[in-house]
């Protein structure tokens, strides 16, 4: 049996073939650490924990990297409000998220790089893009030339001309093209900054991930993952940067999980419709959140409400009730039948998981087996 993965880049399921036989390199975008994490963040972490666990079950050696964005406008704003250093804010919420990962029984990543730890490499990456004509400095900032990269828009399916139409008003006149994006931002009073050839400043969000992925996993990776809200502009821009730097396809497979929804809308800090991981774990066990995800398709939106939580709790209870010695009731005939059913259940499990990690079907087969 071969594993098939839905690739956002091709918009279809593809046979899974790794760059190096038996090994998987996987980069998953982590949180921007400026506030308490919510169950939407947990969903992405759990989805790729499930992916990793299955790949390892199938015999692959997985190197899994998840980053922390620890320099960002939102972190800086939070620090100003509290009157503390931005690194104090970042460390506070990194520590909290690390604990949440343990509470949720998520396997530790191979590495957890931070943007501030890769500043030398980030500056070198920006300089390389300038040297190759893909970027240009302007008044202390550095911008990426989207028109220079012929594949821009291939992940999201957008065309530059169509995107430009939405940027007719309040366009930064320093940009050569309205869709050009910042690789480096010149320093502002009171903000953290680092010295660079273009003056003191800090990196843009997108270049951070390109560089962290490269320094941890190399020029090419097997899987790049994250929430589907990151497809554009973040992952689109990562492709443009990384492939411009190295002249190779960046990631073979782009995997995106759906969003956790509350009251019919994406769970978001900016909107305010969220449930923190802390508050969830005060009322429910961690396994219930994992079961909610297992009962659904990872690429689809997941509604968070009392009904879905209760359904997950009942499913857990059913599984736990089956965790006892299977004693045949009718002699050896029943034992042989049970063994045959267990073989078929495993085959169904593998077939479902090989089909783009179809955990919903997997759980269906598992519950059918539990009934026996």
What residues fall within each predicted segment?
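N-terminal, positively charged nucleic-acid-binding surface of large information/translation enzymes
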Residues: 10-13, 19-105
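Short, polar/flexible loop-turn hinges at active-site or ligand-entry regions and domain interfaces
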Residues: 82-88, 109, 299-303
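Alpha-helical recognition segments enriched in aromatics with Gly/Pro capping
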Residues: 1-34, 49, 120-327
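Short catalytic-loop micro-motif centered on adjacent basic/acidic residues
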Residues: 64-65, 110-113, 224-226
């Amino acid at each position: 049996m071969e594993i098939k993965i839905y690739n956002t880049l091709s918009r279809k399921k593809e046979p899974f073939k790794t760059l190096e036989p038996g090994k998987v390199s996987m980069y998953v975008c982590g949180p921007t650490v400026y506030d308490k994490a919510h169950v939407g963040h947990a969903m992405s972490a759990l989805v790729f924990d499930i992916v990793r666990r299955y790949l390892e079950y199938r015999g692959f050696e997985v190197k899994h990297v998840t980053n922390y964005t620890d320099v960002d406008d939102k972190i800086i704003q939070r620090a100003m409000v509290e009157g503390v250093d931005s690194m104090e804010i970042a460390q506070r919420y990194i520590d909290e998220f690390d604990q949440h990962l343990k509470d949720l029984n998520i396997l530790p990543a191979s590495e957890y790089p931070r943007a501030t730890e890769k500043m030398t490499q980030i500056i070198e990456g920006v300089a390389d893009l300038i040297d190759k004509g893909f970027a240009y400095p302007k008044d202390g900032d550095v911008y990426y030339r989207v028109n220079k990269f012929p594949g821009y828009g291939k992940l999201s399916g957008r065309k530059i001309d169509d995107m430009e139409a939405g940027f007719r008003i309040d366009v930064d006149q320093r940009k050569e093209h309205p869709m050009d994006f910042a690789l480096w931002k010149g320093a502002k009073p009171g903000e953290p900054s680092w010295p660079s050839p273009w003056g003191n400043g800090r990196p843009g969000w997108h270049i951070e991930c390109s560089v962290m992925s490269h320094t941890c996993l190399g020029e090419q990776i097997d899987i790049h993952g994250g929430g589907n809200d990151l497809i554009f502009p973040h992952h689109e821009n990562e492709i443009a940067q990384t492939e411009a730097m190295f002249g190779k396809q960046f990631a073979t497979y782009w995997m995106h999980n759906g969003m956790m929804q509350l009251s019919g809308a994406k769970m978001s800090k900016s909107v305010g419709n969220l449930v923190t991981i802390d508050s969830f774990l005060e009322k429910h066990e961690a396994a219930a959140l994992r079961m909610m995800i297992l009962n659904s398709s990872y690429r689809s939106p997941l509604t968070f409400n009392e009904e879905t939580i209760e359904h997950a709790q009942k499913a857990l209870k059913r599984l736990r009730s089956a965790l006892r010695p299977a004693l045949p009731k009718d002699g050896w005939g029943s034992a042989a039948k049970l063994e045959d059913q267990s073989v078929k259940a495993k085959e169904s499990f593998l077939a479902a998981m090989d089909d783009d990690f179809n955990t919903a079907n997997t759980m269906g087969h598992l519950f059918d087996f539990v009934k026996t």
